[in-house]
């Protein structure tokens, strides 16, 4: 949830360019930004590869958007070039610098993603809620279900039973927010619990943050392949 202080509002009003995901991901910002000509919503830009949300059993939900788009390396690269293009329009004198920065970011981002083998069969995993779909192509993951469709709502007994009855491996990797408690997943039996932060809070370098998330996720699923 987004809390806006007066200082945030002033910074937004003073900014020459505001990049945000859009109403679907940051609804509290919509009133402030939707009519701001300097604000660009990435989800409405047409530059991203966007996937639908899935239910807790992996079925795509029609007319929905999974907003965790930044986890897909190709999307991250597109965002970098998009920002470079926008800033170049505003400051043509700095165009070469902006595009050089975008190219460097793209090279580093794609190198990080190419470190993982995507040729073998997808490695199954569970999540507390479905937030990692955009990592699956790069890390060769296969979604086998989620405990809940809302991280703030406890899983039902029926869903826990479904996961246990349909588990593809005896030992499963569970990706979850750090605030998830053992009581919420202990009935899943043999699992490797991996706390992850898909929002990358408290990180100041995107490629480094993506690498950290990828390493944790990959290690978790590989531990269940043995």
Predicted regions and their residues:
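Extracytoplasmic metal-acquisition and chelation regions
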Residues: 2-226
